[in-house]
């Protein structure tokens, strides 16, 4: 909610998740491999009766990418979902607020609110978001850093307007083992209804990465939208993604060379951001030249050990 309308150059890896045949979406997502979208688990399940939850049928979902508005999304930017995989330890009761046992500050927990949507034909006009391993995240991301949330959800709560790609800035507040919290900047802005599953991008000293996925609003604020959020931490779920998707998961580690500013008119809404592309160039470079040695080797090499890491991470 809040924030600013995106431009074509700012679409990056953000996608819209729709019910099949619908003219607009109900959730958002992020492209993490040419044929693979990550989104929130609660966007990819159905609950036919209370307490009975299962993955949505593949034929019931579509994804759209490369567009700024639902009204301008023609058939060329829409793909049918061929397979839906929901995390086997997804806690729907926790996400729906019916049971928050063990929740920490702001409602942070370990509900595994993540699902994968598979497509069979790649998009022509959407980028694959680079990801961070746990070790590189620890090195590059910290409390107080600036991040950007993008999605097709509600951007005007009073009027309930949605269906356009909006971007808002947020401050990383708490980084947990499976989720992270953001706090809003001034003025009000963060995720809202329909942004669920959408990306949280973070600028770092080595480029800009997909850090998390929108899960829900914080539990310690008064507003439903725009006042901080809870995000599924991608680095903690990389072992599950690699195990579930197999060779269909072709992660991108290099941010690349083409810079994409997420800021309106190049302006910097945060006067004193810490490091990253905001500090370097006054813009959030979704694809910027890396510094230091070999981010690609770091990520792709780590994938070889993800099956071993998954056992350790699952015990946290």
Predicted regions located by residue number:
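C-terminal subregion of chymotrypsin/trypsin-like serine protease catalytic domains
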Residues: 15, 26-45, 53-67, 162-175, ...
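Solvent-exposed loop/turn segments at secondary-structure junctions
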Residues: 21-23, 37, 43-45, 70, ...
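N-terminal activation segment of mature serine protease catalytic domains
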Residues: 1-22
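Chymotrypsin/trypsin-fold serine protease catalytic domain
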Residues: 68-73, 78-81, 110-190, 227-228, ...
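Conserved catalytic-core segment of clan PA serine endopeptidases
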Residues: 6-7, 21, 53-124
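Juxtamembrane/start-of-transmembrane alpha-helix segments at the extracytoplasmic/lumenal side
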Residues: 285-300
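A cross-kingdom C-terminal cell-surface attachment/processing module
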Residues: 296-315
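Short, small/polar residue-rich loop motifs at catalytic or cofactor-binding pockets
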Residues: 23-26, 193-196
